[in-house]
Amino acid sequence: MMWTISIILAAMCFGGIVDVTGVMGTVAQGLLKVAKGRGGLVLATELMCLITNAVCCDQYLALVLPGRMFKEKFEDMKLRPENLSRALEDCGTITSNFFPWNTCGATMRNFLNVDSSYIPYAILNWLNPIVSVFFGYTGITMTKLTDEEYAAILEEREAEKQAALKSLEA
């Protein structure tokens, strides 16, 4: 049990370092350059979740980091926050057990005494991200922000920007 807890602590520390240094942001910017349209954005979000699961070794980081990185892009495409949340869940959560060094994979292997040979048979875990990307490209279940909601988001961003500038001056 201590081994699993130590992996979680190390993953959180590593995730913080990767976030603060901007490494994951650089990867996200590269993905965003090729993400054209709604479907490309969903695909980029899911790829970022997979990369984060593999690199940062923690499912929670695979939800939080890509969520923060892609939030504004989803808003700028006038997609409701539920769309981002679903993309994160459809790939970030459900694929974390594919990586034996990830906290979910390590916990599963320790508690259930199961090795990685089950992965080809985890059909839901493979199929769910594919269906999510399909929904992104076709627009099925992808809800949009109204113009009023988007205007409110832009006002909130500006207020946050002004507050940050004010705190720098102090």
Task: List the model feature ranges, each with a label.
Residues G40-N53, M77-F98, I119-N128:
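Alpha-helical transmembrane segments of multi-pass membrane proteins
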Residues D76, A106-A170:
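Juxtamembrane and boundary regions of transmembrane helices in multi-pass small-molecule transporters
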Residues A11, L31-M69:
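Hydrophobic alpha-helical transmembrane segments of multi-pass integral membrane proteins
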Residues V23-A35, P66, K73, C91:
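Hydrophobic alpha-helical segments of integral membrane proteins
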Residues V20, M24, D58-L61, Y137-E148:
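Transmembrane helix-loop junctions in multipass membrane proteins, especially transporters and channels
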Residues M1-G25, V42, E46, L50-I51, ...:
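Core transmembrane alpha-helical segments of multi-pass membrane transporters/permeases
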Residues M1-I5, T21, G30-E46, M77-L84, ...:
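Membrane-interfacial loop-to-helix junctions in multi-pass transporters
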Residues V27, Y60-K73, N102-N113:
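Re-entrant/interfacial helical elements at transmembrane boundaries that shape
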